[in-house]
UniProtKB/Swiss-Prot annotation:
Function: Catalyzes the methylthiolation of N6-(dimethylallyl)adenosine (i(6)A), leading to the formation of 2-methylthio-N6-(dimethylallyl)adenosine (ms(2)i(6)A) at position 37 in tRNAs that read codons beginning with uridine.
Main location: cytoplasm
GO molecular function: 4 iron, 4 sulfur cluster binding; metal ion binding; N6-isopentenyladenosine methylthiotransferase activity
A cellular-component GO term for this protein: cytosol
Catalysed reaction, written as an equation: N(6)-dimethylallyladenosine(37) in tRNA + (sulfur carrier)-SH + AH2 + 2 S-adenosyl-L-methionine = 2-methylsulfanyl-N(6)-dimethylallyladenosine(37) in tRNA + (sulfur carrier)-H + 5'-deoxyadenosine + L-methionine + A + S-adenosyl-L-homocysteine + 2 H(+)
Cofactor comment text: Binds 2 [4Fe-4S] clusters. One cluster is coordinated with 3 cysteines and an exchangeable S-adenosyl-L-methionine.
InterPro entries for the chain: Elp3/MiaA/NifB-like_rSAM, Methylthiotransferase, Methylthiotransferase_CS, Methylthiotransferase_N, Methylthiotransferase_N_sf, MiaB_methiolase, rSAM, rSAM_horseshoe
Entries under SUPFAM superfamilies matching the protein: Radical SAM enzymes
Subunit structure: Monomer.
Protein's recorded name: tRNA-2-methylthio-N(6)-dimethylallyladenosine synthase
UniProt-listed CDD domains: Radical_SAM
Necessary cofactors: [4Fe-4S] cluster
Binding site for [4Fe-4S] cluster 1: 12, 49, 83
Name of encoding gene: miaB
Taxonomic lineage: Bacteria, Pseudomonadati, Pseudomonadota, Gammaproteobacteria, Pasteurellales
Amino acid sequence: MTQKLHIKTWGCQMNEYDSAKIADLLLSTHGLELTEEAEQADVLLLNTCSIREKAQEKVFSQLGRWKTWKNEKPGLIIGVGGCVASQEGEHIRERAPFVDIIFGPQTLHRLPEMINQIRGGKSSVVDVSFPEIEKFDCLPEPKAEGPTAFVSIMEGCNKYCTYCVVPYTRGEEVSRPLDDVLFEVAQLADQGVREINLLGQNVNAYRGPTHDGGICTFAELLRLVASIDGIDRLRFTTSHPIEFTDDIIDVYADTPELVSFLHLPVQSGADRILTMMKRGHTALEYKSIIRKLRKVRPDIQISSDFIVGFPGETNEEFEQTMNLIADVNFDMSFSFVYSARPGTPAADMPDDVSEEEKKQRLYLLQQRINNQAAKFSRAMLGTEQRVLVEGPSKKDIMELTGRTENNRIVNFKGTPDMIGKFVDIQITDVFTNSLRGDVIRTEDEMGLRVEQSPQSVIRRTRKEDELGVGKYVA
């Protein structure tokens, strides 16, 4: 009887990417088939996030629900991974001794051996070490699931913002070798992927070693990925302003595959708060980056992250953030009230903004950005938008749905052969959470750039053993 795997994932896109890799890995090594029904699983994994408030308690609450199944099914294996696992380590076992495996973001590739050890009679396995980039060498080939895909190009962060736990839970910055990244992208392109989203905690700090001993910058990587045939839309997340160099802006000027949409976290519009956060830039320097971008891409839309109620934030400083939001004209945001993360420098600062004040500021901030986003959507009425078709519409299976460069959902009448391809749509209606339109051009009429085939990239970047035989991680 086929055994089942259930993974519950919290947090960022990096965690989503890691969970997908875990599922592929354990299917190839142990034949574990992924299930959405946790009760059916033989292996239960919790991939955690430590960014949000009370992250640890959320983990133990979930584990408490799983404990009853462990009592009923003694052979059930329970594992905890992700950033909370990295942060808490053995403490998880102290509070929840029924947990079999504790693994960090950098040791997920060792899960097959950990499972073997538990099945071999070992009571528990804990490995939350930081073996740099080793995990990418031990994961199976990527499998495309639709026309879009994420590709992790680096891990960790060296910025040590005072409120953030990432450097402590995912380690410092380590970039994947250039050929490894291109090989994965080419494999996905060969399977029909049309949009790639490059991932990293500080993605634009990428400095990947090349086969000849050099270093590939993030700007160079963007151009190389965009040159692979079939990859006609390119995104990246999450970037840091102090790494957003002019050579990256130059890519926006000459690489049409790079979308006119950027997520660039700023956190606050007040310089004193930015200094206390150890962000390394001022509000004016942030706006300077946006001005340069809009000079080469006048239509680019910007989203950001904001923390309101950081220790010591005054009403005047919050207004500076609101002014920045208006000046930049952000399209959307991920915004949160400040809550201290244990072990970070900011946790030692007096948290002197009341919860009521934090919530009020958050409401005002989100209301302003929502209003700005609505104006952007209304301005799209009557315009022509390029849409990547993802599949049937959730609202009407007789229609198709896709996304624009600026992440708007568009529903329209089309044919099944359009799925996984681009179409140009004339926007005819604007709704709160979606747009409607009519097809005016199919992909065959677009003349998309053709430069190098995925197969040629695969041949050039595949790894070989000492006999010159190609090696593929299976």
